[in-house]
Amino acid sequence: MAKPLIIPAQSMSFSLSWRDYFEMTKPKVVALMLLTVLVGMCLALPGAVPLQPLVFGMLGIAMMAGSAAAFNHLIDRRIDGLMARTYNRPLPKGKLSVNKAFSFAFSLGVLGFVLLYWWVNPLTAWLTFASLIGYAVVYTAYLKRATPQNIVIGGLAGAMPPLLGWTAVTNELHGNALLLVIIIFTWTPPHFWALAIHRKAEYAKVDIPMLPVTHGVEFTKTCILLYTFLLALACLLPVLVGMSGPVYLVGSSILSCGFIYKAWQLKYQDEPGLAMKVFKFSIYHLMLLFVVLLVDHYLWG
């Protein structure tokens, strides 16, 4: 008779801890962010991206983004425990202590900064550090609790990744990279406001002044619709300056029309769960938009 498989308690504990630390880095969010970093790198150069800034740049930026996410978990641990979307996170569940979580977040950020500073360039290291502070401190610790415009103002930190990718391979700021920042900056409010509509009661419960809580759902739906039009214009900027060609023009136009249509549905159709559908669509919108940017660069550029 086969003996039952017995996993030592210590091994199980290590496995669970590893998963908890990994969850704190918000891997799905970081993965989408790294796509925009990669596209920023590729668009900055006419040919192939050099291996060193590609590998160390992606790794260092990912580590600092994971650090920012972990600090977000730390700062929001009280309200996370009261919201259905986040109550199962490691800190509210007591799977990790505050000290361990802080040590992890701090160490990950320091290692990422050192990696970028020494093996990529100081400019990228400092810009990534500024993004970390912008998200973890300015947005999470202050803006999120202070104003319904938290997403609009704080969105700048989350819009930086393509610029970081650009500077990682060029060691300089460029106007074209800023256009990519503008696109993500404009995309952020309708993306998060759709989620905020879906989770309005939870945000109200923990006194977070998201726009649907302070100004109502209908006003927020109007803002989402208006922002999708603004985003459509922002998405045309790479074409207007000659940075991208017809492949991107067609692809981005289709995606923009899709987002506007979804926002129009949200505003004028009373369909349960539609806000969450808009939120999910916005993720695919950004992902596909940057893929189209990349395809256009190598086919047309």
Curated annotation (Swiss-Prot):
Record-level GO BP terms: heme O biosynthetic process
Membrane topology: Multi-pass membrane protein
Protein name (record): Protoheme IX farnesyltransferase
Organism: Shewanella denitrificans (strain OS217 / ATCC BAA-1090 / DSM 15013)
Gene Ontology MF, one: protoheme IX farnesyltransferase activity
Transmembrane segments: 29-49, 51-71, 101-121, 123-143, 150-170, 177-197, 223-243, 244-264, 281-301
The EC number(s) this enzyme carries: 2.5.1.141
Pathway: Porphyrin-containing compound metabolism; heme O biosynthesis; heme O from protoheme: step 1/1
Role noted for this protein: Converts heme B (protoheme IX) to heme O by substitution of the vinyl group on carbon 2 of heme B porphyrin ring with a hydroxyethyl farnesyl side group.
Reaction(s) catalysed (UniProt annotation): heme b + (2E,6E)-farnesyl diphosphate + H2O = Fe(II)-heme o + diphosphate
Misc: Carbon 2 of the heme B porphyrin ring is defined according to the Fischer nomenclature.
Pfam families according to UniProt: UbiA (PF01040)
UniProt subcellular location: Cell inner membrane
Superkingdom of the organism of origin: Bacteria
Similarity comment: Belongs to the UbiA prenyltransferase family. Protoheme IX farnesyltransferase subfamily.
Record-linked Gene3D superfamilies: UbiA prenyltransferase (1.10.357.140)
CC per GO annotation: plasma membrane
Keyword annotations of the record: Cell inner membrane, Cell membrane, Heme biosynthesis, Membrane, Transferase, Transmembrane, Transmembrane helix
